[in-house]
Amino acid sequence: LAKIVALVNKTLKTHIGDDAVELSSQDVVSAINKGKSTGGAKGKHWILDPVDGTLGFVRGDQYAIALALMDEGDLKVGVMGCPNMPKQGDVLEFETSYSYGFSPRLVSKMLAGDSLGWYKGCIFTAVRGHGSYMFPVDEKLNFEPSKVTVSGAFDPQKAKFTEPVMKANSSQGFTAAVATNLGIECKPLRIYSQVKYGSVARADADVFMKFPKAGYREKIWDHAAGVILVEEAGGRVSDAGGAPLNFAGGRYIEGLDRGIIAASSALHE
């Protein structure tokens, strides 16, 4: 706890300066405990997943810090930090790799690219009606935010698709059957966390599909930030029946029809 309190105070001083009030451990704990809202359709709600993709984080693989603002049931802002996400999507090996992690070969490929010192660490931002943008996690790198857009691909047979790594709450077999029926020939790129949404938003992948196993309820913090990022990048996110995801029902996505699909608007149709 002491390390967390020290980091909080350091961050406050960095952004506020000498006027920042130093917080005690009890102050920090009290602030954390305020995050007990049950959500809902009324008012403004911050939707936070502080470490999305916990297993990816532990393994040194993909994870995200994901934050979204919902106002009267509608997503308005999304911010997602992806510390291990490669800057360049073309380093991904869809045909030979099932992982978005850091094998020695992948690291070599990332470093060999035209990354100008920025080879990993991406922050995505989106504001409703203003598009989605990406810039480096490392603030010392001098890069202006760049606008990201979803893939223009329309042919399902050539589509690159991504899905969750974990089988515990996602039916990879069902997803594979859907991909086969659509004629998708590419192997899936399996990624921890909402980095999957970032991959679709900047066109590393054309489609994200997740079909949860029976009885599993999708939590809003696992999707909110990623959904607005894809939508503001020109994509569409819905359940398998084509309905928008409902974030206004509380802590869970209510009324979900079978699964979640995120893609470019043209391909989604």
Regions of interest found by a model, annotated:
Residues 1-51, 74, 84-87, 138, ...:
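N-terminal subdomain of lithium-sensitive/metallo-dependent phosphomonoesterases centered on the IMPase/IPPase/PAP
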Residues 43, 74-76, 121, 257-258:
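Conserved catalytic motifs of the protein kinase core domain
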Residues 46-66:
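Glycine/serine-rich anion-binding loops at beta->alpha junctions
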Residues 63-64, 83-85:
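A short acidic/small-residue loop/turn micro-motif
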Residues 84-87, 92-269:
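An extended, acidic
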